[in-house]
């Protein structure tokens, strides 16, 4: 398997520290609001990556944090007349609702910044002792990128170029423009923790370094996140961690592309900002997941009403295939057609193409294409045979590949199924009695439920619109 490494700017063969095992850290959300569709992309992409690694036989330890103390959280707490704990707990709960809806599995561990203060203080203390960081009079502690000769190696920007665009705010006491806060001295009314430098709270970048070291170790296999995190967040993580621990921080860096809305980059200031909840209420959660993995993960994705509708339609093709297989199995026969082995080989060729695509830097776009080729093959060459063995073989293969992508996870609604089957039986009886007005009336009733009927030689098939 090859993955594109942002550090080297090329695809590299995946070689893990411990053969057969993968240690991955993904930057999680700052929990002060509902997650937006930009947040959804890394969640769905790296969940799919994890699923695929497990599918290929790796044991995956996947850690994703919650930033539960931050300027934005404090501001939100003031706006709502509450406290940072209430705000973070509220939006972590909402996060679980949205991720469950998108079929994003829980990480192995979901550490919170506030539960790792001791580890954070320990790393900062080491950096101060080694001369990479320094405390100032107001209780802040700053890191000096100029002391780390490899600073800029991830974003491929020399420190002098970065310094040219940096500014110092009047209230900051740092020595150089690029210095960044590891610890922030307490301000009146803000939450704080005790430290050797006085009461305060951690900076954003140090939180991830601490949680990586505690839950995965000093060196990990893969660190991932959005392209917007390459600089300064991931660059600063590398500097802190490598200066503290004296070993490489991560062997591979994976970054997903941006989300555009109607071909314009999504931003609150432009008013083209959508939460996952907003979109899910109109279109459901699964089309969001489908959209997020419909393009190669490093390329940008465009969100629009037309595109999300296309995603719904594509998903419906997958659900129709699943339901058609189930329907065909109800009347399946034990007899095997003469070309059964040839048909199985054809079906397996789509699996081979799927693996080839996913092995090539998680190319989910080509992976999906292979799944739809499988669907066409099933519809043309499996379902018409009514062969029980072939139908089961096809269904298991279909479920295997869609499961890796985290798709087709909605269970059948048994109550709805029963009601629809009851109406179909009544319609069939009306047609036999030549009461076509009643049959048409029942068909209209079924259509009003969002169900499409298809009359076939083997009976009536149906699916949701």
Task: Please describe what each predicted stretch is.
Residues 1-32, 47, 97, 118-326:
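Alpha-helical recognition segments enriched in aromatics with Gly/Pro capping
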Residues 8-13, 17-105, 455-462:
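N-terminal, positively charged nucleic-acid-binding surface of large information/translation enzymes
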Residues 265, 273-465:
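Structural preference for alpha-helix termini/caps and helix-kink/transition segments
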Residues 78-84, 108-114, 198, 226:
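The substrate-binding groove and active-site-proximal loops of carbohydrate-active enzymes
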Residues 58, 132, 451:
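Short phosphate-binding/catalytic loops that engage adenosine nucleotides
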Residues 66-70, 92-95, 105-120, 138-147:
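Short, glycine/charge-rich beta-strand/loop segments that flank catalytic centers
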